[in-house]
Amino acid sequence: MKKKCIVLDLDNTLWGGIIGEDGPQGIALSHKGKGADFIAFQQALLDMHDRGIILAINSNNNPTDALEVIRTNPNMILKEKHFAAQRINWNDKAANIRELASELNIGLDSMVFFDDSPTNRHAVRNLVPEVEVPELPEDPSLYTKTLLALPYFATKAITDEDKMRGNLYVTERLRKEAEKGFSNQEEFLKSLGLEVRVYRNDDTSVERLAQLTEKTNQFNSNKNPLSPEEVLELIESDRHEVFYAQVTDRFGDYGITAVAF
């Protein structure tokens, strides 16, 4: 089954060492020595993010210390903006994962959890069996190889919307935070500056239009998935019209969200 989200521990997973013991300045994260293994792993994760995989944090840590590293360490490849959601606290990690799934509105079975601790991996496997928990080798130099060997993130074609997905979840978090400043939803929606652009018989996004026909939710009245070639055939046909909508607001671009044949 294809997975949507990688949930990441921090200490000895995204960097070497433990912040609570080594301090934010004492962790291993550099382009030389042991720290280079974590740089390589972060780069592979960033590549996943840029292909549309959601990244989230699940760490038992003091949030102030952890965020100091993420925000200020010059060797961090992954920035705060790359994480769609965070749970940096002292709660059990299985509970954190359930909260992350709820916040992101995705299924537990679409998540993969990376943690260097065998104890944490065992706990999550038992308490949240829907989540995939790969064995992470003791040697950090093998982290990247382990990630790239997983079969869960393969895709037939990567669309612009796929590439944007990680950012879409980040901007959605910003919207939710902004909504708290409004007394009613109507005023909040007005503040978004929503703009919908409708395109007719445009062949520049056939991969995405075909992708939308594969959706299995209640908003798909077609129920017959189309290939990109079939979509293009409809666009070029004299007997059909193809319309699609792209939505933006002040926080960002939702991408192509609807198609009608």
How should these model regions be labeled?
Residues M1-Y169, R173-F261:
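Catalytic cores of nucleotide-enabled group-transfer and carboxylate-activating enzymes in metabolic
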